[in-house]
Amino acid sequence: MTVDEAETGAGPDSEPAAAGAGWRPGAGDADARVLVVDNYDSFAYNLVQYVGEVAGAVTVRRNDAVDLAGIRALDPDGVVVSPGPGTPAEAGVSTAVFALDRPVFGVCLGHQALCASRGSRVGHAPEVVHGKPSTITHDSEGVFAGLPDRLRVGRYHSLSVEREALPDELVETARTDEEREVVMGVRHREKPHLGVQFHPESILTPRGKRMVRNFVEVCEEHE
């Protein structure tokens, strides 16, 4: 979750995602078709742009403009759940999408939705962060494959997942390298479901596009 809608402006290139758009060809060499669930966040467009640069095709739906049956009808190879204001309970289809067996990548609010879908608690973060660069450590798997052990990322959130309440089916994959550690990433032990609390599409996350590419590769491998 971002602190509020205004805080998520990603710079001059940001614009609202086109919620009703059909499949648009991507510029990448991958065949995967990726749906982006837009949680009414200005960062969603940046995610769509990143996905479009590496995937075979991309489309966008607002979180209240499609249900699980509609997503299945679209038949994407993977789904990205965007950041946004509010809580997972207020984010439409964003939590239900994790009932799918196909790859799903949750970003910020999407990450919290993944955790909430498995019974995790989402509460107030140790501090409210708005465009804060942080260093994280990670497990070098999933979206972190092939990346340095320590990464700089951009954080925009007032809520976070409570580590003590993570169920056994979720593995913590990243955390802040600070005195008050915050869960920065999780993955499901069996399903190809991944989440990150930070914003890979932010200018404050230099390796963010590689993370999106890694997710598209997960989609390719799952086909």
Model-derived segments and spans:
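N-terminal beta1-alpha1 cap of cysteine-dependent amidohydrolase-like domains
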Residues: 1-95, 206, 210-223
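A glycine-centered loop/beta-turn motif at secondary-structure junctions
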Residues: 177-223
